[in-house]
Each structure stands twice: as structure tokens, then as C-alpha cells.
Amino acid sequence: NIVVLVSIVVFGFKDGLKVSALKSTVLMLVTGSVSSFIYSIFGAILSCIMMYIAYRYMSKIFSLIGVSIIGAVSHNFAQVSVASFVMNNFRIFSYLPFLMLIGLFTGYFVGLASIYIIKNLKKNFSEVFER
């Protein structure tokens, strides 16, 4: 998700969404699992949408760490929702609190890494940010 968040910040929503879709497609090709693609693509799309909204419209409230946490939590929620629908079992939502806790930690570190990368991109490739 580092690459997705950096793509959203540097290039915008459409490119972030393309990177998300590409990430899910590569996962499917590597694992050979269509079911992993289904879970991944729904998580990636919701995560990308939520990160964009948080970054674009709530950047005074949320830092990139907060934006990343929103993305991680959204990704987990989407995957659990799809699993619940596919398996026709709402008990799967009982995993959500644990996954949300993990999402807080992973989102925090993804946000930190994204801040570092964007700071270095701005320093070394300032012309990208001048458009």
C-alpha cells in the first residue's frame, strides 16, 4: 500500500486506482488464485477510494499516517465483507476487531514509509510536484 498511497499523493486518484488494480492482478498471476484476486481487488478499491477522500478532503485533520490507517482499515473491512458475502456467513465479521488492530499498526508504518518516500521524491524530483 506504500506505492498506492505515494501514487495518490504524487499523481492523483486515477493513477492510485490503476496501481491498486495492477497490484491485485499481479497477486492473482503469482498465486494463480482467482479468489485471492476477488478479495484483493475489493479491498484495494475501497482502500484507494478512502485514502483519496481522506487525503484530498481531510488533510487538515489527517496526516499521511492517518490516511494510511484509514486505507488499511478500509481494506480489511472490504475483504471481510466480501468473504462474508461469498461464504454466506456473517460470523466472519468476528475477525474484524483483530484485523482492525493489525490495520492500525500496518497503516502506521505504511504511512511513515510513505512520508519518507514522498519527502525524498520532493527533494530529488521536484519537477514532478510542480505540475
Please annotate each region the language model reported.
Residues 1-15, 50-55:
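Generic transmembrane alpha-helix motif of multi-pass integral membrane proteins
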Residues 4-5, 54, 80-87:
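Generic transmembrane alpha-helix signature in multi-pass membrane proteins
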Residues 22-53, 64, 87-91, 96:
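Interfacial aromatic-anchored transmembrane helix boundaries in multi-pass membrane proteins
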Residues 56-73:
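Internal alpha-helical transmembrane segments of multi-pass membrane proteins
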Residues 94-131:
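Alpha-helical transmembrane segments and their cytosolic interface
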